[in-house]
């Protein structure tokens, strides 16, 4: 019997990288898992076949679609919001429409998903939002909008923790540093610069982030809410 046997889990953004590792972790631990995808249909199909989880197409930039997928998931025990994008470049040169889409996916979707989930969660429900260490530290130029979107999650989680606490629901933010995914590979061009800023000079693995998520979703973290949990090899220290 797994740690999450009988639990219902929805993961927004679960087809690749950190999201896929979280899907695998909860399935391995016995949960009934649904996950969303947008641009990675083939990866989502493979993951669903591998794990038995259910894949659901959802554009996280569409507020109504986000609310709908949460609502149709029923009385969730655990919500994980991992969907996110990056828009990078000098602020004076970026397209305003791209920035609006970034904020819709990285800020609006986590907010609306969390609120809708809390409406139907039982006492003891868990909400985990995947943020970024860049919400605390931005050592390079060209990432202001991305950093702003991740910093916003901190205030959101602290405020929603106050609103959800009387319902017995916790909400926390997991803030990864450099993690070995296709978006930021361990052998990529940024490796040496990133590792020079870290005490543990390697990229983290998606499974390490999934492990932190699983702990925060479990019974030992029932008194933990409104907090930021950084997993970054001291990138932000």
Swiss-Prot record:
GO terms for molecular function: cyclic-di-GMP binding; NADPH binding; oxidoreductase activity; protein homodimerization activity. It holds the Pfam family adh_short_C2. Disruption phenotype: Mutant shows decreased biofilm dispersal. Deletion increases the cyclic-di GMP concentration in the cell. Induction: Expression is time dependent in biofilms and is controlled by BdcR. Keywords: c-di-GMP. The active site is at 146 (proton acceptor). SMART domains: PKS_KR. NCBIfam families: PRK12742.1. This is Cyclic-di-GMP-binding biofilm dispersal mediator protein. The gene is bdcA.
């Amino acid at each position: 019997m797994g740690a999450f046997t009988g639990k219902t889990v929805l993961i927004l953004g679960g087809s690749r990288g950190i999201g896929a590792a979280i899907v695998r972790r909860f399935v391995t631990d016995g949960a009934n898992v649904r996950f969303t995808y947008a641009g990675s249909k083939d990866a989502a199909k493979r993951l669903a076949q591998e794990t038995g989880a259910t894949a659901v197409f959802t554009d996280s930039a569409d507020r109504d679609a986000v609310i709908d997928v949460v609502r149709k998931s029923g009385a969730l025990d655990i919500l994980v919001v991992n969907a996110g994008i990056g828009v990078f470049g000098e602020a004076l040169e970026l397209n305003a429409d791209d920035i609006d889409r970034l904020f819709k996916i990285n800020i609006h979707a986590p907010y609306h998903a969390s609120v809708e989930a809390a409406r139907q969660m039982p006492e003891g429900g868990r909400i985990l939002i995947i943020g970024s260490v860049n919400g605390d530290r931005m050592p390079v130029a060209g990432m202001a909008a991305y950093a702003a979107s991740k910093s916003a999650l901190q205030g959101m989680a602290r405020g929603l923790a106050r609103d959800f606490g009387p319902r017995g629901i916790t909400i926390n933010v997991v803030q990864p540093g450099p993690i070995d995914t296709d978006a930021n590979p361990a052998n990529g061009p940024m490796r040496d610069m990133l590792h020079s800023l870290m005490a543990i000079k390697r990229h983290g693995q998606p499974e390490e982030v999934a492990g932190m998520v699983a702990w925060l979703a479990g019974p030992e973290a029932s008194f933990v809410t409104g907090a930021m949990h950084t997993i970054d090899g001291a990138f932000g220290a």
